[in-house]
A protein has these predicted regions:
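Anionic-ligand-binding alpha/beta catalytic cores of soluble enzymes and soluble regulatory domains
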Residues: 258
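Glycine-rich, charged/polar anion/phosphate-binding loops
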Residues: 254
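Beta-rich carbohydrate-recognition and catalytic domains
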Residues: 1-146, 150-205, 210-251, 263-264, ...
Length: 274
């Protein structure tokens, strides 16, 4: 497929939602939520992951659909934000938010995590038997999204951070970054929240990475305004410091996630259509 020589990538006949960037061997894989807006006034319906690749963050090559959605009766009727992780030589996994408004608990639509696999970062297949839901004990069932999975080298296991809400945390300050752990990327256990500042409704699109001697936690909120925040700590155990200016860019650039080539780290986000 042809290249687009422009900084602000936009597919034909659709809109870009949250981005899920991944870097390997000179290429940035910019997975994104592909919103076709098939019904006037409706947003994020029949959303799937599509892919654009770039070597310089200027020229993008559109690669088409990466992960297909499920049927109307499946949890992944819509596919939302997640992350990509490599395991082994050519074994990749994408963990993503699955959402179907018709699947409800106590009258409310629930979110869950599903998983897809690939051997080339282009072609993906969802594991229909994998479905990970909130424990409904520490965390509410209704906000359980945006899984960010990474290898904790010190512990020798995998960690998953999620946009979640503490059970009984209140309507306006219950938002937290949930923590789950696994040794095999299949079986996961819920742990106490990774970060729970009691400041936001929810904390979307969490991500953590190390740069220099600091760890950075990135997340996005809409409590007071649409923006992406970051926190800093010397270890993953915290304490997480709040910088004086703790936001990325402006409200027009939302849900920022990053990818690094080992030397530089680039931020990817979506810009509002109006």
């Amino acid at each position: 497929m042809g290249q687009m020589d422009k900084l602000f990538f936009k597919p034909d006949h659709a809109w870009v939602g949250d981005l899920i960037p991944y870097y390997e061997n000179g290429t940035y894989y910019a997975y994104y939520l592909h919103d076709p807006r098939i019904t006037p006034g409706e947003f994020a319906e029949q959303t799937t992951w599509h892919l654009a690749t770039t070597e310089d963050c200027r020229k993008f090559r559109y690669q088409g659909e990466a992960i297909a959605r499920g049927g109307d009766d499946r949890p992944n009727k819509n596919i939302y934000t997640g992350s990509v992780i490599k395991k082994g030589e050519n074994e990749y996994y994408a963990f993503y938010t699955a959402y179907n408004a018709d699947i409800r608990i106590h009258g409310k639509s629930v979110q869950s995590v599903m998983r897809a696999s690939s051997q080339d970062l282009i072609h993906w297949e969802t594991d229909e038997d994998f479905l990970f839901v909130a424990d409904d004990c520490m965390y509410e069932s209704f906000d359980w999204r945006d899984p960010f999975v990474f290898k904790n080298e010190e512990e020798g296991n995998y960690w998953m951070l999620l946009a979640a809400r503490k059970k009984g945390g209140g309507a306006h300050r219950g938002g937290c970054t949930a923590l789950c752990k696994s040794r095999d990327l299949v079986n996961w256990t819920c742990e106490e929240p990774f970060y729970a500042p009691e400041m936001y409704v929810t904390m979307e699109c969490p991500e953590v990475f190390r740069m220099g001697s600091w760890w950075y936690l990135v997340f996005s909120t809409f409590s007071d305004r649409f923006t992406t925040h970051y926190r800093m700590a010397k270890t993953l155990d915290g304490p997480w410091e709040i910088p004086k200016d703790d936001v990325f860019d402006t409200r027009a650039d939302y849900a920022i996630k990053t990818a690094s080539d080992g030397q530089r780290r680039f931020a990817f986000g979506w810009i509002a259509s109006k």
